[in-house]
C-alpha cells in the first residue's frame, strides 16, 4: 500500500474547500491516515520547497503559504501518488482540466504566478517520505 503527503493550501482553506477536497479523497477510496491543521513558517517551507529557495518567486511563495492555516495529511491506497496528482490537476490553474480540484476551484492570481492552486501532493515515493518527515516529525 502506497502513501503520500497532501496539503490543502491557504487559499483552499480560506475559500472553504476543505470538505470538498477530503470528500474527493474518500470517494476515490483512499484512506486518510493523518490529518492536521497547521500554520506553516519560513523554516518548514524552506525544507519543503528546498529546490525552490533560490528562485526569485520564493519570497512570494512563503508569503502565500504563511497567509493562513493549511491542512496537512497522509493518504494511502493503490497508486495513490499518481492518482492524487491526477485528481489535483495541472500545477498552473490555467492549464488544469475541469473535473480536477485545480480545474474546478483554483484561481491564478496573475498571468505569471500559479501559486494559489488549492492543493499539494508529493510527486514520488521519495518526495512523499521526505515531506511526511518534514511536516509530521517536525
Curated annotation (Swiss-Prot):
Principal location listed in the UniProt entry: cytoplasm
Coiled coil, from the record: none
Compartments where found: Cytoplasm
InterPro entries xrefs: NDK-like_dom, NDK-like_dom_sf, Nucleoside_diP_kinase, Nucleoside_diP_kinase_AS
Keyword Magnesium attributed: yes
One Gene Ontology term, aspect cellular component: cytoplasm
Record's keyword terms, sorted: ATP-binding, Cytoplasm, Kinase, Magnesium, Metal-binding, Nucleotide metabolism, Nucleotide-binding, Phosphoprotein, Transferase
Catalysis performed (reactions): a 2'-deoxyribonucleoside 5'-diphosphate + ATP = a 2'-deoxyribonucleoside 5'-triphosphate + ADP; a ribonucleoside 5'-diphosphate + ATP = a ribonucleoside 5'-triphosphate + ADP
Subunit structure as annotated in this protein's UniProt entry: Homotetramer.
Family of this protein: Belongs to the NDK family.
Name this polypeptide is given: Nucleoside diphosphate kinase
This protein's encoding gene: ndk
